[in-house]
A protein has these predicted regions:
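Ligand-binding cleft/hinge of the Venus flytrap
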Residues: 33-35, 48-58, 135-154, 185, ...
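Beta->alpha turn/N-cap motifs
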Residues: 23-29, 62-67, 76-88, 112, ...
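Flexible hinge/capping segments at coil-to-helix
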Residues: 99, 110-127, 361, 372-391
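A ligand-binding cleft/hinge motif common to bilobed small-molecule-binding domains
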Residues: 68-71, 84-94, 138-143, 162-196, ...
């Protein structure tokens, strides 16, 4: 693929024409295809149409193929690509991607009853793939990365590869999970371990950051309104998909009232190019690690350990070292925006900062939880029948008591319980399990997990 430096955003043409030109495969059902009425249809087509409605644009679908799609995008013939467009490390060197909205898997199929519980157990066996497919590349990469050899046998189609498995010509077959499900083959089963996970997203030209933010804002609004899940259910029914992780909804999302014409057409170079710094041998500067004094809460120690392990593994893979920026907990993202840090951990994404820096996908989710003794019959507020339930909350949580009562009223058990203020975090579990003065502890799940780990390191 010939890569050229783009100096103007796709927004220039979109703003001039009020039209979004979408490159799409016309034969990739149920994601994008041309239906019997001559209309582009499918899950991704519906997402694009919903985005266009949200932005006040008209959609023009342009047919592309797997041979010319990349060139069509890079040349400016289309503004975006859709249709099982896989977000991969290789492609990220050339393109940018929106939030992913579907996760597929390349999976190994075996005959039902065969004794293969993992991919490694099929080492040396004949495995069928469709020739030239992404599944063939995924299997070869998995094999090379792990040093596990397969006899890879290619067929002209997925159907022919499945037929070969049924006829005992091979012992396994690798294909895309959604396609394998639609094939509906009897007497076959899946090996639990995926060969490769493949997220699908909207593809746009690299470094077109303003356009990408506009697309991501629309996807987040579709997620926040429930429309994204509705579109998904229309095509895939009850098949699970983790949209909470795939399309995170940032704080203050709806406070951004800008329209399409308000986004800049230019594609600016980054003010502080991190890759160049790392390539020159300088360390990765990380903000957001808290100081661990004697009185530091347990959750600080837990999160510091997790965040250090995360960034140090990243640095190892990037062949660089880590430098932790001191006194950087108050606003670590601002240090990234100013160039004083390369990366910030433990950041809550907010849309008002999206023009200054990029966020990764979430790597940790947390929320309100109840911690109860191991032998308790409580699984939640709904079990607090009768009276004399005492729920502890932390004194330094300004909304703790109010939140306890809100949950209690929601489950119609407000009259059955009373609250207890925990002034010393270190006493919380002892008060519940030894003194038996409270029935449960209410708090943030990370804080409760940290207390559990320090009380019993085996948890």
């Amino acid at each position: 693929v010939a890569q050229t430096r783009v100096t103007q955003s796709a927004l220039a043409g979109i703003q001039a024409s009020d039209t979004l030109r979408v490159g799409a495969y016309f034969n990739a059902a149920p994601f994008t295809w041309l239906n019997e009425r001559g209309e582009v249809d499918g899950y991704e087509a519906d997402i694009i149409n919903a985005i266009a409605i949200e932005l006040g644009l008209t959609v023009e679908f342009v047919q592309v193929t797997r041979q010319n799609d990349d060139e069509m995008l890079l040349s400016g013939a289309v503004d975006v690509l859709i249709g099982q467009q896989a977000r991969s490390h290789d492609r990220e060197a050339i393109f940018d991607f929106s939030h992913p909205y579907y996760v597929n898997e390349h999976r190994m199929v075996i005959r039902q009853g065969e004794p293969y519980g993992s991919l490694e157990q099929l080492a040396g066996h004949a495995i069928a793939v469709e020739i030239g497919s992404r599944s063939e590349r995924a299997l070869r990469r998995w094999s090379e990365a792990r040093g596990v050899p397969f006899e890879i046998v290619t067929y002209l189609s997925e159907r022919a590869a499945l037929d070969a498995l049924a006829a005992h010509e091979v012992d396994g077959m690798v294909g895309l999970l959604d396609s394998l499900r639609r094939a509906g083959r009897q007497q076959m089963s899946l090996v639990n371990e995926p060969v490769m996970v493949e997220p699908y997203a909207i593809v746009l030209r690299r470094a077109d950051n303003n356009f990408r933010r506009l697309l991501d804002r629309s996807l987040q609004r579709l997620k926040a309104s429930g429309r994204l899940e509705q579109i998904y259910a229309e095509w895939f029914g009850a098949e699970p998909m983790d949209f909470v992780t795939l399309v995170p909804v940032y704080d203050d999302l709806y406070e951004d009232t800008r329209g399409v014409d308000d986004f800049a057409r230019e594609v600016p170079l980054p003010a502080y190019p991190v890759r160049e710094r790392l390539a020159s041998g300088q360390p990765l500067r990380v903000a957001g690690i808290a100081a661990e004094g004697q009185d530091a809460p347990a959750v600080v120690r837990l999160m510091n350990g997790l965040n250090r392990a995360l960034v140090e593994e990243m640095a190892r893979r990037w062949n660089t070292t880590v430098e932790y920026v001191p006194d950087s907990v108050t606003d670590p993202a601002a240090l990234v925006a100013s160039g004083a840090a390369d990366l910030a951990v433990g950041v809550y994404p907010r849309w008002s900062g999206a023009d200054e820096f990029d966020y990764s996908l979430p790597y940790l989710m947390h929320g309100d939880r109840l911690l109860v003794p191991a032998n308790s019959r409580l699984s939640g507020f709904q079990d607090m029948l009768g009276t004399n339930w005492i729920i502890g909350y932390f004194a330094d949580d300004p909304d703790g008591e109010e939140q306890v009562m809100k949950y209690a009223e929601h489950f119609n058990v407000g009259q059955n319980l009373r609250t207890f203020q925990i002034t010393r975090e270190s006493d919380a579990i002892y008060t519940m399990t030894v003194e038996d003065n409270i029935s449960a502890i209410f708090g943030d799940s990370l804080r409760l997990q940290a207390l559990m780990r320090e009380s019993d390191p085996s948890t």
